[in-house]
Amino acid sequence: MASPRLLALLLLLVGAFNAAAAESIRETEVINPQDLLEGRYFSGDLPDDEDVGGPGQEPDDFEWSGSGDLEGPEDKHMLPEVTHPLVPLDNHIPERTGPGGRVPTEPKELEENEVIPKRMSPFDGDEDVSNKVSMSSTAQGSNIFERTEVLSALIVGGIVGILFAVFLVLLLVYRMKKKDEGSYDLGKKPIYKKAPTNEFYA
């Protein structure tokens, strides 16, 4: 007669095998798209889009979609032929006809159409025009403390450092005061107390 533990182990193994077999059958199950239209599936029981295919379609039929580098399947009737009408390509731009279509030819009209920049040219004034261009490495390397972000970071870092030092000193003072009050037992008391050796005679 088998022990109850052995029977329980055997039932557990058989149940696990049946669950694994049922799951593998479910994964390879082919779903007909007509079943979806007839409403045989409930709202949360729909299969994945990858599982739904036309009748007779294998997963290999779908591998030809993508970049188009490879030639497609031999069935040419699946791909419709598109014919584009031939359009002559030239770069001829038609002339505009109308009030704004005339190009000015007289010098006075050309001067009126000129766009004059509003800023002064550096060559117009008495300013000393220098051809020296400051490199980024030399311009920033002159003094790092002239930059506002570096200066603000140093100030904030200094304030945080001072606050940390103040809190550290306050913690040390607090601990020293606690030691002075006697809250810590600094003296060692003997663990074993010697019994009195006085003898009484009657």
Curated annotation (Swiss-Prot):
Membrane-topology annotation of the record: Single-pass type I membrane protein
GO cellular component, one term: extracellular region
First and last residue of the signal peptide: 1-22
Biased amino acid composition, Acidic residues: 46-63
Annotated region (Disordered), positions in chain: 41-75, 87-112
InterPro entries: Neurexin-like, Syndecan, Syndecan/Neurexin_dom, Syndecan_CS
List of glycosylated residues: S43, S65, S67
Keyword tags: Glycoprotein, Heparan sulfate, Membrane, Proteoglycan, Secreted, Signal, Transmembrane, Transmembrane helix
Residue ranges, Extracellular side: 23-152
Post-translational modification remark: Shedding, cleavage of the extracellular domain to release a soluble form, is enhanced by a number of factors such as heparanase, growth factor receptor action for example by thrombin or EGF. Physiological events such as stress or wound healing can activate the shedding. PMA-mediated shedding is inhibited by TIMP3. O-glycosylated; contains both chondroitin sulfate and heparan sulfate. Ser-43, Ser-65 and Ser-67 can all be modified by either chondroitin sulfate or heparan sulfate, and the protein exists in forms that contain only chondroitin sulfate, only heparan sulfate and both chondroitin sulfate and heparan sulfate.
Residue intervals annotated with topology Cytoplasmic: 174-202
A Pfam family it matches: Syndecan
GO term, biological process aspect, one: cell migration
Chain segments annotated as transmembrane: 153-173
Subcellular location as annotated: Membrane; Secreted
Oligomeric form and interacting partners: Homodimer. Interacts with CDCP1 and SDCBP. Interacts (via its cytoplasmic domain) with GIPC (via its PDZ domain). Interacts (via its cytoplasmic domain) with NUDT16L1. Interacts with DNM2; this interaction is markedly enhanced at focal ahesion site upon induction of focal adhesions and stress-fiber formation.
Family in the record: Belongs to the syndecan proteoglycan family.
PANTHER family according to UniProt: SYNDECAN, SYNDECAN-4
Task performed by this protein: Cell surface proteoglycan which regulates exosome biogenesis in concert with SDCBP and PDCD6IP.
Record-given protein name: Syndecan-4
